[in-house]
Amino acid sequence: GGKSMGRRAMYHSTMFEDMGFHYFGPIDGHDEAELERALRAICSQPGPHFLHVVTKKGKGYAPAEANPGNFHGVSTFDLAHSIPDPEVAPKESFSTVFGNLLNKQGSENEKICAITAAMKYGTGLQFFYHTHPKRFFDVGMAEQHAVTFAAGLASQGMLPVVCIYSTFLQRSYDQIIHDVNLLKENVVFAIDRAGFVPADGETHQGIYDPAFLSQVGMPIYSPS
């Protein structure tokens, strides 16, 4: 009835319940007592369950709450002042150099636009974003859409630069072939974390892009 519809509209549970899940939540994921109560209650009931837990990135540390992108992956640092440890503080990275250069070129050429998949800071695009916000597009964790979107922009005369980590570019291989390569669209792929990436762990090793991109005849350039 109306009560059930109201509950579903409020908690967005319809999709999960339509799939046969019992929906619970949303609850505060930072409240350990509440979270434990919910988990114990769910475990005592039969059937599949969906627990909706709401959290905030960086919760409890003001600098991270204010700027979560800068705290996506960090080394040791002075917690009181949010200053990196001098012994592990990174030198100017490839991503920073690239980001500053693209930002400069964006000021010289209004056709240039930047696209990323939830990696604005990781690919150095924060500079372009602040200077050219109307030509910056973060599509979220949707690499396939990022590539197809870039092909669409290129077809209309724009010069899209797609900035994605090598290991995540693999997800969009079908779109690279069909939407960019076969249609001969002018899209630039700025591939971050290419090659061996010790600091980012096993999942972020960019060791396949030379093989799968050269297979479809895409020119590959690497800074010396």
What is the predicted function of each stretch?
Residues 1:
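Active-site cavity-forming subdomains of large catalytic enzyme subunits
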